[in-house]
């Protein structure tokens, strides 16, 4: 029988961290061996905090002990700067990062890619692990060839720190690359309230909504003569991200170098 994948989870007491622990605990080929938190949950059993019962893994408060349990993979949903710090420590230790937190800069990604290449070890960074969200981005890329007029509305819970979301930025980049032309504005716009038309990424307006009761949602709205096309994805709870996260956790061990975006794993 093959050995189980040894998994560590950072941000273990957060919403995504707890969901990841539940998902890992339910897999016959995985086992949780380490967990990292900040304040909430530190010193408690990770399984108890996640709601699946004691797993015998205590949530640590400092990353220094994270690799003592010799994990194969580090699942990390901490914000960008902390995730970068964890990855820089993980890769030299032979631990493969699977990062879902947003906020990493291009310089951060380039540095992590270089580190992974030098150590010949895999890593996955994905703005969104929901398979439906990946398909939404792909469908939007296809639609952009025929509908160059497009705007993006992304909606998230009110605890999300970054705006716009990484998914919205990645969608804008994919749409911009696929468009055969950039349409001019129909009129010269005058914003009587600054920011009313949203922020622009790759020339595409993005509108961010943050409200209690939301989880993660995005609409990509295309317009053409006499018609509109809306491509929408909704994550109604954290479980929507788990199939993609588990796929990345299994596949990262066979990778050499950094993969950015879950779609790269679906294509291979």
Regions found by a protein language model. Give the residues of each.
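Rossmann-like NAD(P)H-binding beta-loop-alpha module
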Residues: 135-147, 163
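Rossmann-fold NAD(P)-binding glycine/threonine-rich loop
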Residues: 85-88, 92-93, 101-123, 139-141
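Short glycine-rich anion-binding loops that position phosphate/pyrophosphate groups of nucleotides
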Residues: 41, 80-81, 103-104, 128-129, ...
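C-terminal substrate-binding/catalytic lobe of Rossmann-fold NAD(P)-dependent oxidoreductases
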Residues: 3-10, 15-68, 148-268
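Rossmann-fold NAD(P) dinucleotide-binding segment
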Residues: 66-69, 73, 77, 81-100
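Short beta->alpha connector loops at strand-helix junctions that form conserved
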Residues: 11, 100-102, 127
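Residue-level detector of anion-binding/catalytic polar loops
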Residues: 96, 122, 149
């Amino acid at each position: 029988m093959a050995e189980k994948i040894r998994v560590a989870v950072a941000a273990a007491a957060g919403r995504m961290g707890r969901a990841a622990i539940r998902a890992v605990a339910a897999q016959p080929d995985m086992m949780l061996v380490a967990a990292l938190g900040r304040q909430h949950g530190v010193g408690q059993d990770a399984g108890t905090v996640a709601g699946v019962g004691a797993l015998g893994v205590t949530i640590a408060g400092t990353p220094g002990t994270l690799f003592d349990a010799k994990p194969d993979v580090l699942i990390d949903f901490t914000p960008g700067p902390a995730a970068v710090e964890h990855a820089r420590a993980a890769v030299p230790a032979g631990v493969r990062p699977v990062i879902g937190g947003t906020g990493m800069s291009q310089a951060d990604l380039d540095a992590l890619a270089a580190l992974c290449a030098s150590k010949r070890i895999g890593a996955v960074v994905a703005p969104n692990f929901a398979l439906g969200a990946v398909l939404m981005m792909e469908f939007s890329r296809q639609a952009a060839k025929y509908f160059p007029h497009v705007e993006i509305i992304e909606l998230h819970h009110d605890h999300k720190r970054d705006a716009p979301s990484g998914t919205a930025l990645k969608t804008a980049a994919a749409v911009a690359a696929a468009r055969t032309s950039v349409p001019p504005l129909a009129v010269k716009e005058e914003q009587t309230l600054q920011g009313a038309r949203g922020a622009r990424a790759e020339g595409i307006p993005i509108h961010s909504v943050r409200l209690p009761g939301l989880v993660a949602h995005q609409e990509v709205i295309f317009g053409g003569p006499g018609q509109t096309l809306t491509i929408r994805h909704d994550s109604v709870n954290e479980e929507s991200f788990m199939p993609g996260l588990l796929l990345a956790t299994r596949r990262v061990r066979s990778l050499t170098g950094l993969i950015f975006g879950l779609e790269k794993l679906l294509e291979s």
